[in-house]
């Protein structure tokens, strides 16, 4: 994009957090003065660095952060709730919109199974074709309704 071959983006959607494990460091990531001071080995630091880099390079671009979905596994869902809180804090600090796929996409832990096919997840974690369509329609609606 920077070399002019592609146009500057109007919208950028981050889908991040599903596999992150280093969830500490939110205050540190948000208090760093510059991106060079951010510890990118933490989820919060990596999210801040990635989002802020897009915002600095493309100030007219509207940025959205897509939160991880519910799964068929209780322990994974607990981790996703923690990850989602980190992403919410970083997103709020950078004033970018959160797309709450965890709580609003239509994929619910009550209809999914751990390690086997459920309503929309083929293995309890990853969406099947119908799940992908469901999430895609939800995200498209959120972008359309909130793009200004």
Region spans (language model):
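Alpha-helical cap/lid subdomain in secreted, periplasmic
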Residues: 1-148
């Amino acid at each position: 994009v920077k070399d002019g071959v592609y146009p500057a983006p109007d919208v950028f959607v981050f889908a991040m957090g599903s596999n992150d494990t280093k969830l500490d460091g939110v205050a540190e990531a948000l208090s760093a003065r510059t991106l060079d001071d951010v510890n990118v080995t933490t989820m919060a630091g990596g999210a801040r660095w990635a989002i802020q880099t897009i915002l600095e390079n493309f100030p007219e671009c509207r940025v959205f952060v897509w939160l991880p979905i519910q799964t068929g596994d209780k322990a994974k869902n607990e981790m996703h709730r923690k990850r989602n809180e980190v992403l919410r804090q970083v997103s709020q600090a950078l004033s970018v919109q959160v797309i709450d796929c965890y709580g609003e996409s239509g994929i619910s832990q009550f209809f999914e199974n751990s390690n086997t096919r459920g309503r929309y997840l083929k293995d309890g974690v990853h969406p099947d074709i119908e799940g992908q369509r469901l999430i895609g329609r939800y995200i498209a609606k959120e972008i359309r309704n909130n793009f200004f």
